[in-house]
């Protein structure tokens, strides 16, 4: 018997094999037979004064649930006593009043089983229990309400138990029918003569024509043509007597995405003169009732169906059906091993259909944990079934996981329903005896002898193929070994300490004994006190790599109140009486599960292949940002060059990931796992980014200013790192590289370093060349409108974050974000930066790398910005106050790159197009951010139809454009600064950017070009310059007006 808190529910919810409860079609979950009760309500109703059998004694109340009471007799008997007292006193309004004498006598008779009615407990005892009724009732109600996974099951169980009518059996979902029929029709009738019912490939909202080995799929929104239907038919061939053989499959439509049940329609194909073959569909002719009669109806359309004869050619009809067991996630490997242990000469055996496993391995889908097909011997019939964990997919989130049992090729409905009940009983019995079963085989799950039995299904749906063998012989060997362990004195600690996810919290499990004399002499041991005075355990470690016992804080289990700490084995000695030093633990996961904040995990393979180790692991340089003090040991990570760190799941996971990554690169002792980050702190950090929202206007080009502010101010909405990566960069003063798992793009095949220090990337031509169904691809995210952002030179430090959705069983509301660190961090991230740049579109790299540029005609008279001027502008526009900017970087001259000559923006400062020209030489400086402007009516710039739109990178976006200008020397900078000033109604600091009259007049040709083309309105521009003369140009206004007049 197992208390249901092992299933993430409450202690009052008990799986109870002795109690059978049927669930009807209208209940939730929809189908299946359940054995479970709410023990509190069950006992109260059993002993209630309204019970037709009269009051029950304590022994009578305990008898139906004796197996549960015996698990902890003292505690559970006290629980039953309180239920009985509550049943007799819940109608009292004043619980502080004395219990009347008659009630005391009745309660004593029930609890003490004493018919004389002597007051054994006394009124005070009952009064104390009654006073706690309200608190206990509220606690029980809250516990049930907090049960997120089994509330529907609880409601169905109690409502059915309270119903006095006979239990009803739920209807199973029929998914496929196999059969073969011969149809005889007169020669004059143009009708198919043989119709086959074959297996179906169940897929959401698909219509399937199934033939001997072919599947033709198409969306239900586009009905099949006659050609498509005829293509699914085998070719006609002549038969004796002039008869012809034609085949067509059953036309089936899956309606709805929440139920896998099939509604059956029969398709009728006939030839019409002048038209050809026509498909007619007869709805609501379900062949589950009378297949021959349904076919006769279909084939006899428009004629006398008495001449149509349908007969079975042999083999019978087989059914494929499924049913939902409940909302619990059953791990199929446990079910398989458990049934193997029970397999004897007289018991039902379940084996694995390895042929089917290997044949259809690639058909397993994401978001579903699929099992191999099991071979089940039932009433001399051999039938196959599978157990899968499914859930409704909504974007990256999965909701309401449930277990679906699918039965294949049942010969009739009686066998099908009998198997369903038998399989359900197997699974519920497994859950009921989970602790005792675990003590038999849990320690052997990693044993090669057990794994060689078949294919093990991992929790993250990764298949590990093991060497097959003679199943029967291996089963006997495993059972003998497990039976020998069962009779020994040593026990698996998980069978004694009821903690969920024990193995995930402790990589090396200890061995527990009840007598200190059973501890081997050469082993150290600790004493562990079980709760509720259930005894003392002596725990030691039987691992060569982790010989020292200790305790670890219980962070994952639902019953951590009862077990705040659990024993574990460690490589080094540690204080067994206190919480372990979290910085010294080596929690490392090889799967893609969501990590806790104290764990590291393996990075996906693509990130490793892109880096190609880069020889940085063997370089002699000393990395000041090395992480040797807390980076997982080489023996743990193997050849991995990077690890990912855990972050709390939530809408602001991206912010926390960057915070932990920044903390990690501060120094050798900056362990990111020690950083305490609360929800309030994340909300504060997010609120501070509102002032920097302008810098993300390119990525948020499809949102208005109001929508942007509302999104960022809503601290419980998802902070999308793909669109808000610039905010993270500017706020934390680091370069942020974002990798995403799961994108269907061509992955990088290799990385080669060029002579000038750059990189060349080679890509796989086809997706299937590089990855199988079980692998994921890491890619650089593509922002909206294709304008990826990269700015390596603004920030001195760099971090890497990783966006993914965990494993198939992760129930996430938002995509999760984690950080990635390298043991030699500063030696790796420059290479990532080069790869990142290389992945960006070339035209975008030119724009963002060389926003300010100029043709260097004369080195003595250069009209480009200097590095100091660029840094000053960066301080003014780019960074929040208090951020320092490095002055060590200097621009480089390049003779091979193209520079943008035309940039197109819209009214809210987003760039939607760019054109370029080749330059002989170029001097690059830092870019300005997108314009921080509000919606406005003032139009200083005009879009000229004469602009050559074909030169824009994104011509389809030019229709959205409200403003455009040519970029020519410093004129572009002046326009940018002036527009920024007037639209934000602010001022520029003249000591940061000075332009005198001599330099301004030197550019009059370029500015005059802007006026002549009509891109810039000269009056508006002149007025703006006059208004800013003291702060920007520092020239007399009369000269400025005269200059504007001169160029009219």
UniProtKB/Swiss-Prot annotation:
Signal peptide: none annotated. The keyword Hydrolase does not apply. GO terms for cellular component: virion component. Its main location: virion. Pfam families: DUF5757 (PF19061). InterPro entries: DUF5757. Keywords: Virion. It is found in: Virion. It comes from the Viruses. Belongs to the ascovirus HvAV ORF146 family. This is Putative structural protein ORF84. The lineage of its organism: Viruses, Varidnaviria, Bamfordvirae, Nucleocytoviricota, Megaviricetes.
């Amino acid at each position: 018997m197992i208390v249901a808190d092992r299933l993430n529910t409450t202690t009052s919810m008990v799986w109870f094999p002795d109690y059978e409860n049927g669930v009807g079609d209208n209940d939730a979950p929809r189908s299946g037979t359940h054995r479970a009760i709410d023990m509190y309500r069950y006992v109260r109703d059993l002993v209630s004064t309204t019970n037709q059998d009269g009051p029950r004694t304590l022994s009578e109340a305990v008898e139906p649930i004796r197996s549960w009471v015996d698990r902890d007799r003292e505690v559970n008997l006290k629980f039953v006593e309180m239920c009985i007292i509550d049943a007799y006193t819940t109608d009292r309004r004043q619980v502080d009043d004395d219990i009347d004498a008659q009630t005391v006598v009745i309660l004593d008779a029930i609890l003490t089983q004493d018919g004389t009615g002597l007051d054994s407990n006394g009124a005070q005892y009952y009064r104390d229990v009654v006073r706690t009724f309200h608190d206990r009732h509220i606690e029980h109600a809250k516990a049930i309400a907090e049960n997120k996974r089994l509330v529907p099951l609880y409601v169905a169980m109690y409502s059915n138990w309270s119903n006095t009518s006979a239990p009803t059996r739920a209807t199973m979902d029929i998914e496929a029918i196999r059969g073969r029929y011969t149809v005889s029709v007169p020669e004059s009738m143009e009708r198919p003569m043989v119709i086959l019912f074959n297996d179906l490939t169940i897929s959401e909202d698909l219509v399937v024509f199934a033939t001997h080995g072919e599947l033709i799929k198409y969306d239900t929104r586009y009905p099949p043509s006659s050609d498509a239907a005829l293509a699914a038919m085998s070719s006609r061939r002549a038969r004796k007597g002039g008869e012809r053989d034609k085949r067509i499959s059953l036309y089936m439509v899956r309606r709805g995405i929440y139920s896998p049940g099939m509604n059956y329609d029969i398709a009728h194909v006939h030839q019409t003169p002048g038209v050809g073959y026509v498909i007619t569909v007869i709805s609501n002719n379900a062949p589950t009732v009378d297949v021959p009669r349904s076919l006769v109806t279909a084939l006899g359309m428009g004629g006398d169906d008495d001449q149509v004869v349908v007969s079975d050619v042999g083999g019978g009809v087989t059914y494929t059906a499924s049913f939902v067991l409940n909302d619990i996630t059953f791990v199929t490997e446990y079910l398989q091993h458990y049934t193997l242990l029970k397999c004897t000469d007289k018991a039902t055996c379940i084996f694995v259909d390895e042929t089917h496993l290997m044949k259809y391995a690639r058909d397993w889908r994401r978001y579903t944990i699929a099992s191999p097909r099991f071979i089940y011997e039932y009433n001399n019939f051999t039938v196959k079934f599978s157990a899968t964990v499914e859930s409704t997919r909504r974007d990256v989130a999965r909701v309401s996981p449930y277990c679906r049992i699918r039965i294949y090729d049942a010969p009739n409905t009686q066998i099908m329903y009998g198997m369903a009940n038998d399989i359900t009983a197997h699974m519920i019995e497994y859950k009921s005896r989970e602790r005792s079963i675990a003590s038999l085989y849990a320690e052997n799950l990693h044993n090669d002898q057990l794994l060689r039995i078949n294919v093990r299904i991992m929790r993250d749906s990764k298949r590990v193929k093991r060497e097959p063998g003679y199943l029967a012989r291996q089963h006997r060997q495993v059972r003998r070994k497990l039976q020998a362990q069962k009779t020994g004195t040593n026990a698996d600690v998980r069978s004694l300490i009821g903690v969920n996810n024990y193995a995930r919290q402790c990589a090396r499990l200890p061995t527990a004994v009840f007598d200190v004399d059973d501890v081997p002499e050469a082993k150290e041991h600790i004493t562990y006190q079980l709760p509720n005075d259930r005894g003392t355990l002596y725990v030691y470690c039987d691992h060569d790599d982790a010989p020292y016992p200790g305790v670890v804080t219980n962070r994952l289990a639902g019953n951590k109140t009862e077990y705040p700490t659990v024993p574990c084995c460690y490589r080094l000695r540690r204080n067994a009486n206190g919480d372990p030093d979290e910085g010294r633990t080596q929690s490392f996961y090889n799967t893609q599960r969501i990590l806790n904040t104290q764990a590291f995990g393996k990075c996906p393979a693509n990130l490793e292949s892109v880096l190609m180790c880069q020889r940085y692991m063997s370089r002699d340089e000393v990395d000041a940002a090395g992480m040797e003090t807390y980076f997982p040991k080489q023996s743990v990570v193997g050849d991995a060059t990077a690890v990912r760190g855990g972050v709390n799941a939530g809408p602001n996971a991206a912010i926390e990931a960057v915070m932990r990554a920044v903390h990690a690169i501060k120094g050798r002792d900056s362990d990111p796992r020690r950083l305490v980050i609360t929800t309030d702190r994340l909300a504060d950090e997010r609120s501070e980014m509102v002032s920097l929202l302008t810098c993300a206007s390119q990525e948020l080009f499809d949102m208005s200013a109001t929508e942007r502010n509302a999104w960022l101010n809503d601290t419980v909405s998802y902070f999308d790192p793909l669109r808000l990566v610039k905010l993270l960069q500017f706020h934390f003063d680091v370069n942020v590289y974002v990798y995403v798992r799961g994108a269907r793009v061509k992955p990088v095949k290799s990385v080669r370093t060029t002579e000038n220090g750059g990189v060349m990337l080679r890509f796989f031509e086809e997706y299937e060349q590089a990855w199988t169904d079980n692998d994921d691809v890491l890619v650089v995210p593509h922002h909206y409108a294709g304008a990826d952002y990269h700015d390596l030179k603004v920030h001195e430090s760099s971090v890497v974050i990783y966006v993914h959705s965990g494993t198939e069983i992760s129930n996430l509301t938002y995509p999760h974000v984690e950080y990635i660190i390298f043991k030699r961090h500063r030696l790796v991230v420059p290479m990532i930066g080069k790869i990142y740049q290389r992945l960006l579109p070339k035209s975008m790299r030119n724009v963002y790398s060389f926003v300010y540029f100029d043709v260097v005609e004369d080195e003595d008279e250069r009209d480009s910005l200097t590095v100091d001027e660029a840094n000053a502008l960066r301080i003014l526009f780019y960074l929040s106050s208090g951020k320092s900017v490095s002055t060590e970087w200097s621009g480089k001259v390049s003779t091979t790159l193209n520079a943008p000559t035309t940039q197109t923006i819209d009214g809210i400062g987003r760039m939607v197009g760019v054109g370029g020209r080749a330059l002989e030489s170029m001097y690059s400086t830092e870019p300005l951010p997108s314009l921080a402007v509000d919606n406005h009516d003032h139009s200083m710039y005009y879009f000229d139809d004469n602009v050559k739109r074909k030169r824009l990178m994104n011509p389809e976006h030019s229709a959205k454009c409200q403003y455009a200008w040519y970029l020519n020397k410093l004129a572009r900078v002046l326009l940018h600064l002036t527009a920024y000033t007037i639209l934000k109604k602010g001022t520029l600091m003249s000591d940061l950017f000075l332009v005198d009259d001599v330099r301004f007049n030197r550019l009059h040709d370029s500015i005059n070009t802007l006026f002549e083309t009509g891109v810039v309105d000269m009056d508006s521009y002149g007025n703006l310059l006059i208004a800013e003369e003291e702060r920007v140009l520092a020239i007399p206004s009369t000269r400025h007006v005269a200059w504007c007049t001169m160029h009219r």
